[in-house]
Amino acid sequence: MARIAGVDIPRDKRIEVALTYIYGIGLTRAQTILSKTGVNPDTRVKDLEDGDVQKLRGATEAFTIEGDLRRQEGMALKRLQDIGCVRGRRHRMSLPVRGQRTRTNARTRRGARKTVAGKKK
């Protein structure tokens, strides 16, 4: 297994697909990296030479990926919560942020139902 950006990428997949296992690299960015480094996208990871792996490591360092990207996203959410804007409050309350309805639906964001006992007559 080749290790790029602290991630073991799968040996038997094409390098174009294998790069997408790194958080922050999708298919388009993987294609960009491969065109810059001159590595054939159809090459399997197990067939890569050490020089190619070094080129790929250097090319991925130009992007914010993995832990840095996760930290950056977390800080952005924390900033919204700290300034007390509507989006930050919705994140804090685990409600949908982008204006979706909550009277019905929104089960994924709100979690499982909490059943409340009915009123006795």
Swiss-Prot record:
Highest taxon of source: Bacteria
InterPro entries to which the protein is assigned, alphabetical: Rbsml_uS13_C, Ribosomal_uS13, Ribosomal_uS13-like_H2TH, Ribosomal_uS13_bac-type, Ribosomal_uS13_CS
Any Pfam family hit: Ribosomal_S13
Key words of the record: Ribonucleoprotein, Ribosomal protein, RNA-binding, rRNA-binding, tRNA-binding
Region annotated Disordered, chain positions: 97-121
UniProt keyword annotation of Transcription present: no
GO cellular component: cytosol; small ribosomal subunit
Family annotation (Gene3D superfamilies): 1.10.8.50, 30s ribosomal protein s13, domain 2
Xref: PANTHER family: 30S RIBOSOMAL PROTEIN S13/40S RIBOSOMAL PROTEIN S18, SMALL RIBOSOMAL SUBUNIT PROTEIN US13M
Similarity-based family: Belongs to the universal ribosomal protein uS13 family.
Stored NCBIfam families: uS13_bact
Function of the molecule: Located at the top of the head of the 30S subunit, it contacts several helices of the 16S rRNA. In the 70S ribosome it contacts the 23S rRNA (bridge B1a) and protein L5 of the 50S subunit (bridge B1b), connecting the 2 subunits; these bridges are implicated in subunit movement. Contacts the tRNAs in the A and P-sites.
Subunit-level organization: Part of the 30S ribosomal subunit. Forms a loose heterodimer with protein S19. Forms two bridges to the 50S subunit in the 70S ribosome.
Protein name according to UniProt: Small ribosomal subunit protein uS13
